C-alpha cells in the first residue's frame, strides 16, 4: 500500500515537493525515482535520528534531489516563512492508529483505544492546517494513513474541506486489509488547491 502513495502526487520533473513525516524515506525516494531525480524534494521529520535513514537510503540509491530537514511539519511556515506557497506537491503520510496493519502488527489490538485515536486527531489536523500555507496555487496535497478508522480518514478530510474551501477533493480511496494478498488497510485523499 505504501508504494501506491507517491504516484498519487503525480510528481513532475522540476517540481518542488515536500514529504512531511518522511522518515525512513521510502516515499521520498520513490518520488525522486518517479521524476528521474529531477525535482527539489524536502523530506521533513521531527526525528533527526530517523532522518539519517532518509539520507542513507537516498545515497544508497544514488538520488541527489532529496534534502532532509529535522522539524515539526505542523510549524514549518514559522521556521521557513520563505516556503509559503512554494511547493507544487505535498505528501502527508500522517501519524495514525495503524488499524489497517493489524495483520502484520497484531499487538495494536491491545494498544489502540478510542482515547488514543481521539488523541491523534488534533495532531493530524495541525499537520494538515500547518502544511496548507506551503502549497502553491494549483498544487496537490496527498493525505495518507495506514488506518481504516473513518475519524482519521474521511471525517478528517471532510473537516479540512470545510475549514479550507479553496481545496478540492480530486480523489479518495479506502483500501481494506486483504488477507489473500497480504495488503494493509490504507486510505488516501488527493486534494488540489484553487
Residue ranges and their predicted role:
Residues 1-194:
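S-adenosylmethionine
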Amino acid at each position: 500500500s505504501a508504494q501506491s502513495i507517491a504516484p498519487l502526487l503525480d510528481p513532475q520533473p522540476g517540481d518542488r515537493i515536500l514529504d512531511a513525516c518522511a522518515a525512513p524515506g521510502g516515499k521520498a525516494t520513490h518520488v525522486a525515482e518517479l521524476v528521474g531525480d529531477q525535482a527539489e524534494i524536502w523530506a521533513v521529520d521531527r526525528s533527526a535520528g530517523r532522518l539519517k535513514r532518509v539520507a542513507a537510503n537516498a545515497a544508497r540509491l544514488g538520488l541527489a534531489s532529496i534534502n532532509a530537514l529535522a522539524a515539526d511539519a505542523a510549524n514549518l511556515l514559522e521556521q521557513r516563512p520563505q516556503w509559503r506557497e512554494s511547493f507544487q506537491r505535498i505528501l502527508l503520510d500522517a501519524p495514525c492508529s495503524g488499524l489497517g496493519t493489524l495483520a502484520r502488527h497484531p499487538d495494536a489490538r491491545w494498544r489502540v483505544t478510542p482515547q488514543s485515536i481521539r488523541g491523534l486527531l488534533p495532531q493530524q489536523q495541525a499537520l494538515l492546517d500547518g502544511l496548507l500555507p506551503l502549497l502553491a496555487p494549483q498544487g496537490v496535497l496527498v493525505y495518507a494513513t495506514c488506518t481504516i478508522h473513518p475519524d482519521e480518514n474521511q471525517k478528517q478530510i471532510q473537516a479540512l474541506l470545510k475549514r479550507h474551501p479553496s481545496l478540492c477533493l480530486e480523489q479518495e480511496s479506502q483500501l481494506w486489509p486483504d488477507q489473500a494478498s497480504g495488503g494493509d488497510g490504507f486510505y488516501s485523499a488527493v486534494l488540489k488547491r484553487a
